Amino acid sequence: MGMTVIAFDFGTKSIGCAVGQSITGTAQSLPAFKAQDGIPDWADIEKCLKEWKPDMVVVGLPLNMDGTEQDLTRRARKFGHRLNGRFGVKVAWQDERLTTTQARTEIFERGGYRALKKGKVDSISACLILESWFEEHPEG
């Protein structure tokens, strides 16, 4: 049976969000969450989790190109641990290198420069993170 999974693209000003099904391996973007220095409105996150009832969440890890961690990687991990602590949801991690670049390219190709809104880029990045996770975990 398939799982519902939500992915987050953590950022200090915006946290992208996407939802998908393991059975199809596809994701759709959801509205991004505004954040203040990486802290979202937890009530908004809770509302999203209650609406979609995910079996788990995937948090993108912004690694350096050589695979090492940076400050933002540690903050993304902290965000994931808080999701688990606050809502009891299982959290998995996914390398997100180059997803923002790929998301910008896809959005630009569809709608040009004006379509490149930060929240939209972050949520498309979350889709790419989730689809990558599905590819690496076909069993769900």
Curated annotation (Swiss-Prot):
EC number: 3.1.-.-
InterPro entries xrefs: RNaseH-like_sf, YqgF, YqgF/RNaseH-like_dom, YqgF/RNaseH-like_dom_sf
Pfam families: RuvX
Localization (cell): Cytoplasm
Primary location class: cytoplasm
Primary enzyme class: hydrolase
GO molecular function ontology, one term from the record: nuclease activity
CDD domains associated with the record: YqgF
GO biological process: rRNA 5'-end processing
Extent of the signal sequence: none
Recorded GO CC terms: cytosol
Family in the record: Belongs to the YqgF nuclease family.
Stated role: Could be a nuclease involved in processing of the 5'-end of pre-16S rRNA.
Name the record gives this protein: Putative pre-16S rRNA nuclease
Protein's organism: Actinobacillus succinogenes (strain ATCC 55618 / DSM 22257 / CCUG 43843 / 130Z)
